[in-house]
């Protein structure tokens, strides 16, 4: 097999994102490091690139950046902030996201599974795509961040809404090309900072207002029925 063919064979099946240089320059080294790990790695390998698989570049309308996957087994499945539908109680950041959505729109999803957002063009991308179980930020030095940089560069070749929650996400704004974008910057929804500018930001209605002004369909963030609050009571 020629070197170029071998590099192509190593690339995950992530549609148009597979053409990013990251998969030739960085992924082989990261993959080798993961293969040497003795700790449990989250999410499972088949879900590691789920965000890119579910929201290809041509469908991406909104990008919500996260940090790294939840380090609790059974929670992370490859989309930032999202958890499997049977997870209760919700992680605290996601709980705050839903509280803000309920205040903004009067409703929120019934579970923590955000796959329906991804299907509508919301790219839920962590800047680091793996984590050792129980060790938040345990893989921050593997080089994953280069993928996020390249995704931002490619996605910003056309108007896109970017949600940058917290200082770490906001540092990546420099990788967004100038353009007719919506860039929302607030405090992170974590309990430590949510009251310093995240609550009251009305980010979900702001994104939909921007999309509809461009003649695009809004994101259905949740069932239009009013939230009953059950996910907040567990």
UniProtKB/Swiss-Prot annotation:
Keyword Methyltransferase: no
Active site (catalytic residues): 68 (proton acceptor)
Keyword Ribonucleoprotein: no
Reaction catalysis annotation: Hydrolyzes single-stranded DNA or mismatched double-stranded DNA and polynucleotides, releasing free uracil
Domain of life of the native organism: Bacteria
InterPro entries, per the entry: UDG_fam1 (IPR002043), Ura-DNA_Glyclase_AS (IPR018085), Uracil-DNA_glycosylase-like (IPR005122), Uracil-DNA_glycosylase-like_sf (IPR036895)
Keywords of the record: Cytoplasm, DNA damage, DNA repair, Hydrolase
Record Gene3D superfamilies: Uracil-DNA glycosylase-like domain (3.40.470.10)
GO molecular function, one term: uracil DNA N-glycosylase activity
Entry's localization field: Cytoplasm
UniProt cross-references to NCBIfam families, sorted A to Z: PRK05254.1-1, PRK05254.1-2, PRK05254.1-5, ung
Name listed for the protein in its UniProt record: Uracil-DNA glycosylase
């Amino acid at each position: 097999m020629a070197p170029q063919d071998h590099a192509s064979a190593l690339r995950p099946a992530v549609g148009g994102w597979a053409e990013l240089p990251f998969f030739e320059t960085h992924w082989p080294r990261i993959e080798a490091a993961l293969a040497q790990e003795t700790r449990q790695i989250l999410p499972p390998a088949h879900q590691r690139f789920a965000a890119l698989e579910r929201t290809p570049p041509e469908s991406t309308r909104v990008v919500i950046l996260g940090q790294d996957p939840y380090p609790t087994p059974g929670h992370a499945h490859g989309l930032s902030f999202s958890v499997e539908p049977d997870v209760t109680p919700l992680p605290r950041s996601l709980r705050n996201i839903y509280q803000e959505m309920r205040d903004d729109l009067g409703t929120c999803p019934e579970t923590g599974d955000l796959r329906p957002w991804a299907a509508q063009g919301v790219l839920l991308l962590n800047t680091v795509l793996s984590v050792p179980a129980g060790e938040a930020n345990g893989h921050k030095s593997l080089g994953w961040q280069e993928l996020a940089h390249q995704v931002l560069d490619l996605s910003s070749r056309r108007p896109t809404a970017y949600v940058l929650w917290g200082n770490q996400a906001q540092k990546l704004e420099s990788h967004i090309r100038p353009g007719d974008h919506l860039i929302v910057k607030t405090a992170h929804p974590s309990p430590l900072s949510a009251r310093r500018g995240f609550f009251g930001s009305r980010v979900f209605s702001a994104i939909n207002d921007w999309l509809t002004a461009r003649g695009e369909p809004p994101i259905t963030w949740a069932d239009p029925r009013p939230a009953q609050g059950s996910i907040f009571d567990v």
